[in-house]
Amino acid sequence: MEQMKITNLTDEQISFQLILHSGNARSCIIQSLRAYKEGKKDEADALIAKAEQDLSAAHDIHFQMIQKESGGEATAFSLLLMHAEDHLMSTLSMKELVKEMLDLFKTKNI
């Protein structure tokens, strides 16, 4: 996935990009668990990989925001940005939990 540059985006557009990528990742993570339940283990792994790509894109955007602010360009606080960051962090936590669950299921042949 090509890295998106945030230099020409508004703060709202940046927030929506974070929400978009973390939302896509969250959907893939949930679909992965459902695929595994249906016995589609390869599909489950592919969905986790897709989720990781979206999370990587979101992380890149977030990192650019941090770099921008550390360079002296302040980021305005907004409820939308707070929601976007919450969405990203909860999706990262969900991914780690589901990956651990899938590893456990595989280890126990469930």
From Swiss-Prot:
Per the record, the domain of life is Bacteria
Q: Does the keyword Cytoplasm apply?
A: yes
* Single GO MF descriptor: protein-phosphocysteine-sugar phosphotransferase activity
Q: Which GO terms describe its biological process?
A: phosphoenolpyruvate-dependent sugar phosphotransferase system; polysaccharide transport
The protein's matches in Pfam families, at most eight in alphabetical order, are given as: PTS_IIA
Induction or repression = Up-regulated by konjac glucomannan and by cellobiose and mannobiose, the possible degradation products of glucomannan. Repressed by glucose via the carbon catabolite repression system. Also repressed by GmuR.
**Domain text:** The PTS EIIA type-3 domain is phosphorylated by phospho-HPr on a histidyl residue. Then, it transfers the phosphoryl group to the PTS EIIB type-3 domain.
- UniProt protein name: PTS system oligo-beta-mannoside-specific EIIA component
Q: Source taxonomy lineage?
A: Bacteria, Bacillati, Bacillota, Bacilli, Bacillales
This protein's gene is called gmuA
